[in-house]
């Protein structure tokens, strides 16, 4: 499947000039996008809880209208839902749905609420996604340095005939068309691939691999600090190499011993059982089973999540990691 990649010449920021662009939420993603849009010359309104920490921060940043969410949505031409997945449905119902005008564009940075029909917008608005592929602080830093981070766009609903142009204009306002903005056919591709990556690889899979490797060496009598360096700390070196030049480049930089040992032993760790587990993870995402479980967890006050996070914080890996980080923070006398 070919993926179309767009650059600056493919996007027109004038599509948004003279329009009211309202950003709901002022966390890492909301603040980064709002500031970049502001610096790109757009008329930005930030919608947050009155007099809360985000309200005060947005006021301090300046150059934007700061107001409540309902007022931010009213008369807005573009509304960006830059809020946590779990809070979006309630905020949409209370503040967005009653105030969203006909012909407006509703933008998401993650497709969860649309994919699983937790939000069902009216047919007379555009529904788009502009999803930067980086955390908010990295987006802002790249923009300030005159570049941008790659982004993904998708159109779920094109009521005006301009939905794609608006999505590309938002990407340009963030600097993402300088890097490259790629288009997918629907929100599902972003939603399900993002969830899968988080659960099976980036957050779930990698953390478990690190924890298990560390504990294996400790159980064999190795000093925890040695186990930490080998099974956790040095992962950054490998990821940096892959990011810099790809997987083959990483292998070429490694010693011959590391190459041979890694290539001949990796299937003992990631094997058919692992593949079956990944397929089951995807099945639960694809069927909506994970969505239902996550919504129930949120409704129950995140009790299981808090308990699991507490358990993670007590791992020997965490204590050893703090000791290792302290070594790198020592200052010369």
Regions found by a protein language model. Name each.
Residues 1-18:
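A short, basic/flexible loop-to-alpha-helix module at the beginning of a structural domain
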Residues 20-33:
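Glycine-rich adenosine-cofactor-binding loop
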Residues 32, 38-61:
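NAD(P)-binding Rossmann-fold cofactor-contacting core
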Residues 69-119:
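Rossmann-fold NAD(P) dinucleotide-binding segment
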Residues 107-199:
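Rossmann-fold dinucleotide-binding core
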Residues 161-165, 175, 180-220, 225-243:
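Active-site-proximal catalytic alpha-helix in oxidoreductases
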Residues 222-333:
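NAD(P)-dependent Rossmann-like dehydrogenase/reductase catalytic/cofactor-binding core
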């Amino acid at each position: 499947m070919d993926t179309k990649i767009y650059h600056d010449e493919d996007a027109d920021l004038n599509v948004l000039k003279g329009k009211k662009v309202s950003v709901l939420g002022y966390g890492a993603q909301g603040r980064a996008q709002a500031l970049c849009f502001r610096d790109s010359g757009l008329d930005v309104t930030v919608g947050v809880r009155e007099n809360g920490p985000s309200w005060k921060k947005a006021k301090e940043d300046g150059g934007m209208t700061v107001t409540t969410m309902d007022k931010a949505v009213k008369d807005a031409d573009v509304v960006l839902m830059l809020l946590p997945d779990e809070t979006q449905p309630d905020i949409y119902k209370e503040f967005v749905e009653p105030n969203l005008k006909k012909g407006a564009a509703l933008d998401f940075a993650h497709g969860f609420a649309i994919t699983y029909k937790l939000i069902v917008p009216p047919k007379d608005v555009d529904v788009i996604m502009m999803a930067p592929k980086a955390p908010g602080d990295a987006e802002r830093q790249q923009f300030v340095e005159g570049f941008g981070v790659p982004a993904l766009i998708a159109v779920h609903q094109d009521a005006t005939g301009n939905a794609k142009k608006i999505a590309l204009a938002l990407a340009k306002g963030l600097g993402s068309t300088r890097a490259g903005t790629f288009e997918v056919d629907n929100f599902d591709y972003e939603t399900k691939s993002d969830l899968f990556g988080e659960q099976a690889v980036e957050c779930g899979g990698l953390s478990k691999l690190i924890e298990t490797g560390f504990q294996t060496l400790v159980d064999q009598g190795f000093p925890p600090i040695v186990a930490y360096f080998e099974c956790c700390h040095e992962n950054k070196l490998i990821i940096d190499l892959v990011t810099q030049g790809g997987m083959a480049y990483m292998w070429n930089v490694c010693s011959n011993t590391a190459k041979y040992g890694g290539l001949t032993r990796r299937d003992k760790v990631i094997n058919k059982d692992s593949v079956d587990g990944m397929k089951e993870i995807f099945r639960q995402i694809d069927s909506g089973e994970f969505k239902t479980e996550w919504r129930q967890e949120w409704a129950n006050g995140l009790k299981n999540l808090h308990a699991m996070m507490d358990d993670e914080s007590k791992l020997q890996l965490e204590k050893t990691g703090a000791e290792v980080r302290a070594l790198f923070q020592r200052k010369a006398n």
